[in-house]
Amino acid sequence: MHLRLTLVALGAAYVCANAVESTMNRLVAETLTLLSTHQTLLIGDGNLMIPTPQHTNHQLCIEEVFQGIDTLKNQTAQGDAVKKIFRNLSLIKEYIDLQKRKCGGERWRVKQFLDYLQVFLGVINTEWTMES
């Protein structure tokens, strides 16, 4: 009985995680569409200068990207469409911040850490663009 309840709980957690991921995918897609549609409004007179990361591994530049978003938000006229863009970006940042909290983990034995390290390096090797 305990095993069955555990499996049900794991299944529910999986469904919940997939629902959140699916919602986030839709939110990102909607935000990309809004950015494309309202780019002229966001550019304004074109004189605003925002520090933009040169690094192509966007995962490493999250803080800088969101600092740029804050700068843009503070310097852009706030119509309904623009409010929606910045509300979406705020929700995306909250999601990323929640995910980052998972980085602080418990202590593991060396073998478990080395297994994690191998997966981590594999992601760097396959998903990150290497710059020289």
From Swiss-Prot:
Pfam families: IL5. One of its GO terms (biological process) is immune response. GO terms for molecular function: cytokine activity; growth factor activity; interleukin-5 receptor binding. Coiled coil: none annotated. It comes from the Eukaryota. It is found in: Secreted. SUPFAM superfamilies: 4-helical cytokines. Keywords: Cytokine, Disulfide bond, Glycoprotein, Growth factor, Secreted, Signal. Residues 1-19 form the signal peptide. Belongs to the IL-5 family. Homodimeric cytokine expressed predominantly by T-lymphocytes and NK cells that plays an important role in the survival, differentiation, and chemotaxis of eosinophils. Also acts on activated and resting B-cells to induce immunoglobulin production, growth, and differentiation. Mechanistically, exerts its biological effects through a receptor composed of IL5RA subunit and the cytokine receptor common subunit beta/CSF2RB. This is Interleukin-5. The lineage of its organism: Eukaryota, Metazoa, Chordata, Craniata, Vertebrata.
